[in-house]
């Protein structure tokens, strides 16, 4: 386990030295990784850092409002509504790697736009060790490492948490006084709900995934999962009222893990599973079927794409 006091001191020094007198922007996604990196960097250089929260349209329910509230102490915070642009980039894209690259490139384009406005030359990211391992091992690319465009319009990229695991990041977040809604938040992929929608990503599918994930997080909170969410897999025939429907299949995934490198599917009570399917299929009109994923990691990854 990392020595938090020493890490925070060293990270602040690293950030200050790397940035000098230059202005930087940081990718603030709302997850614990980027939020902790933003808090670290803001403590190091203040408003010299411009935190950029991009609403991609692929975020969790209520996430944008939460970010505005939690980080309102950062006077330099920028919130960018880019949802239409992200959906335009994802139109017709079905390959998981192409999705990640499209999202990563659009992220950087959004940051470059803000960087030009504030004359920023540096980019700070919340990359952690498992991100780098999966990317270097070609298991999958991560939008903040493997999905960057070949040519990035910044002079440097600073990744102060590149050697930390998720539980260590949480320790740092608590040390920095971040609210529990951030420090204890379940992991959320950089590309957002796009990697929880199999096939083409559309606003309608994402809306289904967002609401289903909200239900899963609510129902499974007592189980204290390392990560729990819903994914939209495809379509299947169902019956609603007196009508046959061809609705979405939603998979529920809930796992236990220490650092995300390996994970075990949680054993949920039958009553809990039935309550999940009742709420998801009963309140989301577009859903016809709910399944529970019992696969560990390995052989599966935690996320679907």
From Swiss-Prot:
**SUPFAM superfamilies xrefs:** Adenine nucleotide alpha hydrolases-like, GMP synthetase C-terminal dimerisation domain
Q: What's any GO biological process attached to this entry?
A: GMP biosynthetic process
One Gene Ontology MF term:
ATP binding
UniProt-annotated binding residues for ATP? 29-35
Task: Give residue ranges for domain GMPS ATP-PPase.
Answer: 2-185
Q: Does the keyword Magnesium apply?
A: no
A Pfam family hit = GMP_synt_C
Q: Which pathway does this chain act in?
A: Purine metabolism; GMP biosynthesis; GMP from XMP (L-Gln route): step 1/1
Function description: Catalyzes the synthesis of GMP from XMP.
Q: What is this protein called?
A: GMP synthase [glutamine-hydrolyzing] subunit B
Q: What is the originating organism of this protein?
A: Halobacterium salinarum (strain ATCC 700922 / JCM 11081 / NRC-1)
Q: What is the lineage of its organism?
A: Archaea, Methanobacteriati, Methanobacteriota, Stenosarchaea group, Halobacteria
């Amino acid at each position: 386990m990392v020595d938090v006091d020493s890490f925070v001191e060293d990270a602040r020094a690293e950030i200050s030295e790397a940035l000098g007198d230059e202005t930087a922007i940081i990718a603030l996604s709302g997850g614990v990784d980027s939020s902790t990196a933003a808090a670290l960097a803001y403590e190091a250089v203040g408003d010299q850092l411009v935190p950029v929260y991009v609403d991609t349209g692929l975020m969790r329910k209520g996430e944008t409002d939460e970010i505005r509230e939690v980080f309102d102490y950062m006077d330099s915070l920028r919130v960018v509504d880019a949802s239409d642009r992200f959906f335009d980039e994802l139109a017709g894209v079905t390959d998981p790697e192409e999705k990640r690259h499209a999202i990563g490139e659009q992220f950087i384009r959004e940051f470059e736009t803000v960087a030009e406005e504030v004359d920023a030359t540096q980019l700070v990211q919340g990359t952690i060790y498992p991100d780098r391992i999966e990317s270097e091992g070609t298991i999958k690319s991560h939008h903040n490492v493997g999905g960057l465009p070949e040519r990035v319009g910044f002079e440097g990229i600073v990744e102060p948490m590149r050697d930390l695991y998720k539980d260590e990041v949480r320790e740092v977040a608590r040390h920095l006084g971040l609210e529990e809604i951030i420090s204890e938040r379940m992991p959320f992929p950089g590309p957002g709900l796009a990697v929880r929608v199999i096939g083409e990503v559309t606003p309608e599918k994402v809306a289904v995934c967002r609401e289903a994930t909200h239900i899963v997080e609510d129902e499974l909170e007592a189980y204290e999962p390392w990560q729990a969410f819903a994914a939209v897999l495809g379509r299947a025939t169902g019956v609603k009222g007196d009508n046959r429907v061809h609705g979405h299949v939603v998979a529920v995934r809930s796992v236990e893990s220490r650092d995300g490198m390996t994970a075990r599917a949680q054993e949920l009570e039958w009553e809990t599973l039935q309550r999940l399917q009742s709420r998801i299929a009963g309140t989301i009109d577009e859903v016809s079927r709910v399944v529970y994923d019992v696969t560990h990691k390995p052989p599966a990854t935690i996320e679907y794409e």
